[in-house]
Design a protein with these regions (language model features):
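Nucleotide/pyrophosphate-binding catalytic subdomain
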Residues: 1-193
């Protein structure tokens, strides 16, 4: 059971670990452009190197958990700008109401989540909560049927995601991890959700 009415069929979270991995980022963004067109999905960024800087420097800077949490989410916003630039037909969105507008215009919405999460503040402020748990919460909030985590390797999402993830993933949301070496799995995972316009 998800939290709200269905806004998208699938939430696709693109992990920052794909950056700099032998063309993985290029393959994944190309696949999203090809497979995502005309399908009711939302792309959610990982924190990538932007959030990793916060993690690495938070102790040195002597910032508290709340500050680090919001700075890391701002890192997700930065990665969202990269994805919106690199995924063909993507549109950067910041709030739930922007998503159906982008979809209606034939665009692939990429969420910069800071404003939405700052208003809702749904998750603990801890490094046990990463973009995986944020994507899981968003899947529930949007009534999505599927959550797809794009990561360097495939496997059990509970083992590959952050410690809070099992609590963040709503019942009834099917979760799958897809790796860049099997992007046909992404097409299959999105296949039930809407038309494919190529």
């Amino acid at each position: 059971m998800t939290n709200g009415p269905r806004v998208v069929y699938a939430v696709v979270k693109l992990g920052g670990g794909l950056l700099g991995r032998n063309g993985a980022f290029e393959r994944v963004t190309g696949a999203l452009a090809a497979f995502g067109a005309g399908r009711p999905l939302l792309v959610v960024p990982g924190g990538g190197p932007f959030a990793e800087v916060v993690r690495e420097r938070s102790r040195h800077l002597q910032i508290d958990a709340d500050t680090a949490h919001w700075m890391a989410i701002l890192g997700m916003d930065q990665y969202a700008h990269v994805l919106a630039c690199r995924i063909r037909r993507a549109a950067l969105v910041e709030r739930e109401r922007d998503i159906p507008v982008a979809l209606a215009a034939g665009r692939i919405p990429v969420l910069a989540p800071y404003h939405w999460l700052r208003a809702a503040d749904p998750l603990p402020h801890s490094w046990d909560v990463t973009s995986d748990s944020i994507a899981a919460w968003l899947a529930g909030a949007l009534g999505a049927a599927r959550l797809i985590l794009l990561k360097p390797v495939a496997g059990d999402p509970v083992k590959l995601a952050d410690p809070y993830f099992p609590r963040a993933l709503p019942p009834g949301v099917a979760c799958q991890v897809v790796a860049p070496d099997d992007l046909e799995a992404l097409d299959r995972a999105l296949g039930d959700g809407g038309s494919h316009e190529g």
